[in-house]
From Swiss-Prot:
Transmembrane segments: none
UniProt lineage: Bacteria, Bacillati, Bacillota, Bacilli, Bacillales
Keywords: Cytoplasm, Ribosome biogenesis
Protein name as it appears in the record: Ribosome-binding factor A
Family annotation (PANTHER family): RIBOSOME-BINDING FACTOR A, CHLOROPLASTIC-RELATED
Purpose of the protein: One of several proteins that assist in the late maturation steps of the functional core of the 30S ribosomal subunit. Associates with free 30S ribosomal subunits (but not with 30S subunits that are part of 70S ribosomes or polysomes). Required for efficient processing of 16S rRNA. May interact with the 5'-terminal helix region of 16S rRNA.
GO cellular component: cytosol
GO molecular function: ribosomal small subunit binding
Signal peptide per UniProt: none
Repeat is among the record's keywords: no
């Protein structure tokens, strides 16, 4: 069953990217990238991880815009993916990109300090 949840998650990720970029006209929803979709084993709940280009204020307004469009997004997913019941969608920020950038910055600083000491 886990394999099916993964396949549904990947299909939802692809469709959500298209829906968010082409169908949602809300100005609050700007540069959004769907980084991952985790679907529960019973296919009832889908957690969508997104990254947003911008500051904290833009991220918050984007999340509010997506929350407002959640019903529309869910109906679009239901039309595009044939499931008995369309999963309940929740949006969360993907913090892993920020963590990765922070680690990369720290590694560059350590590398520069190591070259100075030589």
């Amino acid at each position: 069953m886990k394999l099916r949840a993964n396949r549904v998650g990947e299909q939802m990720k692809k469709e959500l990217g298209d829906i968010i970029s082409r169908k949602i006209k809300d100005p609050r929803v700007g540069f959004v990238t769907v980084t991952d979709v985790q679907v529960s084993g019973d296919l009832q709940i889908a957690t969508v991880y997104i990254s947003v280009l911008g500051d904290e204020e833009q991220k918050d307004s984007t999340l509010k815009g997506l929350a407002k469009a959640k019903g529309f997004i869910r109906s679009e997913i239901g039309q595009r993916i044939r499931l008995r019941k369309t999963p309940e969608i929740s949006f969360e920020f993907d913090e892993s990109i920020g963590y990765g950038h922070r680690i990369d910055t720290l590694l560059h600083e350590i590398n520069k300090e190591g070259k100075r000491e030589e």
